[in-house]
């Protein structure tokens, strides 16, 4: 699993974080000081990259959290197999199967021969956009 660590206070909306073992994109973040002697807390709302589930995290601002390492790659669609696509990496020429994305506009563009940008996040692959 490819991950690194960051301080929770350094992150902002749009960054990625691992909550409960799932990579998520931060959509909302607020910081508040709890009281006279308490340390500041951060309230993070994030959406899972693969599941789309909403996850929340409340933790001290200075806590170290896991951040996924996202590898951005380019591939070409070889075959459409229903809910799966067969994709060939343009650098290593390795072939693999990946699920079709849920976005309808993107699904319409995914035909054999089309180049796509895909991400490898914690060993899983997902198609992001066409090139």
Curated annotation (Swiss-Prot):
InterPro entries, per database record: IF5A-like, IF5A-like_N, NA-bd_OB-fold, Rib_uL2_dom2, Trans_elong_IF5A_hypusine_site, Transl_elong_IF5A_arc, Transl_elong_IF5A_C, Translation_prot_SH3-like_sf
Domain of life, per lineage: Archaea
A molecular-function term among this protein's GO annotations: RNA binding
NCBIfam families referenced in this protein's UniProt entry, alphabetically: eIF_5A, PRK03999.1
Organism whose genome encodes this protein: Staphylothermus marinus (strain ATCC 43588 / DSM 3639 / JCM 9404 / F1)
Reported function: Functions by promoting the formation of the first peptide bond.
Family stated for the protein in its record: Belongs to the eIF-5A family.
GO cellular component, as recorded: cytoplasm
UniProt-listed Gene3D superfamilies: 2.30.30.30, Nucleic acid-binding proteins
Alphabetical UniProt keywords: Cytoplasm, Hypusine, Initiation factor, Protein biosynthesis
Positions of post-translational Hypusine modification: 36
Protein name: Translation initiation factor 5A
Membrane-traversing stretches: none
PANTHER family, A to Z: TRANSLATION INITIATION FACTOR 5A FAMILY MEMBER
